[in-house]
């Protein structure tokens, strides 16, 4: 289940390149997908930051507003080694909006402040807008061809390496927890470890569909998602031909399991496939069941939107694209070239 061993949609690249030679080579801006209400007991703060991770900024905002750390929320984690524009939410019932022009934190700039009625929770984004500068590319012709394929055919919707912690530590700890080698009491760590476990199982399912030649082929019992929506339905044998046509034109997406405490939501051939692939991961599945993690489904294909690129020279390309919330730029870049700086963290 190592990220480096997962299957490729467009074949393993031969070309090499560098991601984030400089922090400004990686820019990501959150798209809330809604306009703040302008009133309410929550204050939304949009920050441009560099050299600061999300939790560090949240802690400093809490101190500035003189509230508990748990009263500051955000929609997702962003890498410190990048330039990011991110929303934070402060719960300030019955209080005036602080003067955020007085908020000083090295590497941070306040861009916007607005009142809102609801708390900003993890995943409550439309998506993220990315601008990457990819350098030291060894074969521009190969990468150009791959860019064209990715723009039209997409990439596997893998969870990126950062989901599993530095050096895969979160997944390692999840395995130790699953086999009762450790006890995990801290809420944040429990969340990180459980997320790593189910993400690894999802990645395995996606990779094995590629290996089996059914990544883009509807199986009887597959859970199919309407493109751009969260709802899904189960494919019936009698409808496979029509459903395959709808998949081929982009109306539908095949999904894979995000395992938890409950039924996987598939039947027939698809259920048998998922059972077989996950047959040697009983310890992680038992952990997710024991901790009552809600099961879910996630599309196996990620299609970047508004994707454009411009070559600065034969070894440098600027790439822009939009991704839905919860998807990873890592999954796009890994289909383009092999990273020379493979430890680079790409924001979610």
UniProtKB/Swiss-Prot annotation:
The keyword tRNA processing applies. Keywords: Isomerase, tRNA processing. One of its GO terms (molecular function) is RNA binding. It catalyses: uridine(13) in tRNA = pseudouridine(13) in tRNA. GO terms for biological process: tRNA pseudouridine synthesis. Residues 154-303 form the TRUD domain. Pfam families: TruD. InterPro entries: PsdUridine_synth_cat_dom_sf, PsdUridine_synth_TruD, PsdUridine_synth_TruD_CS, PsdUridine_synth_TruD_insert, TruD_catalytic, TruD_insert_sf, TruD_pseudoU_synthase. The keyword ATP-binding does not apply. Signal peptide: none annotated. The active site is at 79 (nucleophile). Substrate binds at residues 26, 128, 328. It is an enzyme of class 5 (isomerase). One of its GO terms (cellular component) is cytosol. Its EC number is 5.4.99.27. Responsible for synthesis of pseudouridine from uracil-13 in transfer RNAs. Belongs to the pseudouridine synthase TruD family. NCBIfam families: PRK00984.1-4 (NF002155), tRNA_TruD_broad (TIGR00094). This is tRNA pseudouridine synthase D. It comes from Edwardsiella ictaluri (strain 93-146).
